[in-house]
Amino acid sequence: MPRRRVIGQRKILPDPKFKSELLAKFVNILMVDGKKSTAEKIVYTALDSMAEKSGKDHLAIFEEALENVRPAVEVKSRRVGGSTYQVPVEVRPVRRNALAMRWLVEAARKRGEKSMAQRLAAEMLDASENKGTAVKKREDVHRMAEANKAFAHYRW
């Protein structure tokens, strides 16, 4: 525990177009080398093409994709008497969002489409339909936690 006062989390400003804090956080995660305007352009282009393809609202698809990628549990390493156990722990809400966004961006970067906006749009559409690499990553994390359920009593 820190002896000084605990510093609260920095308030993030909502994005200029949709006034969404989640979307602003997503832009920040996508951003490379501090190029925020480029990241915003990529995200907005991806959202526009997604809305065009599916006929749904921009933010609705984004929220649905995030919801399908958010992990409920994850495993953390815990050393007990010389051996290391993978202990399943529940994921805090802020970390859930952060992991989901990070996994979406990683999965989009590995795709084969031409531009990053196309890759991101395709990955988010897949995630909103419960398929794709990011959803597979969440399933793997859940499977790992399920397999190590026996060590849940080592939680701290």
Swiss-Prot record:
Q: Write down the PANTHER family for this protein, in alphabetical order.
A: RIBOSOMAL PROTEIN S7
Q: Source organism's superkingdom?
A: Bacteria
Q: Which CDD domains match?
A: uS7_Bacteria
**Record-level Gene Ontology MF annotations:** rRNA binding; structural constituent of ribosome; tRNA binding
Q: Which GO terms describe its biological process?
A: translation
Record's keyword annotation contains rRNA-binding: yes
One Pfam family this chain carries?
Ribosomal_S7
* Assembly information from the UniProt record: Part of the 30S ribosomal subunit. Contacts proteins S9 and S11.
RNA-binding found in the keyword field: yes
Q: Which organism is it from?
A: Vibrio parahaemolyticus serotype O3:K6 (strain RIMD 2210633)
Q: Which key words are in the record?
A: Ribonucleoprotein, Ribosomal protein, RNA-binding, rRNA-binding, tRNA-binding
Family classification: Belongs to the universal ribosomal protein uS7 family.
The record's InterPro entries line, in alphabetical order, gives:
Ribosomal_uS7, Ribosomal_uS7_bac/org-type, Ribosomal_uS7_CS, Ribosomal_uS7_dom, Ribosomal_uS7_dom_sf
Cellular-component GO terms for this entry: small ribosomal subunit
Give the protein's recorded name.
Answer: Small ribosomal subunit protein uS7
- Family matches, as SUPFAM superfamilies: Ribosomal protein S7
User: What does it do?
Assistant: One of the primary rRNA binding proteins, it binds directly to 16S rRNA where it nucleates assembly of the head domain of the 30S subunit. Is located at the subunit interface close to the decoding center, probably blocks exit of the E-site tRNA.
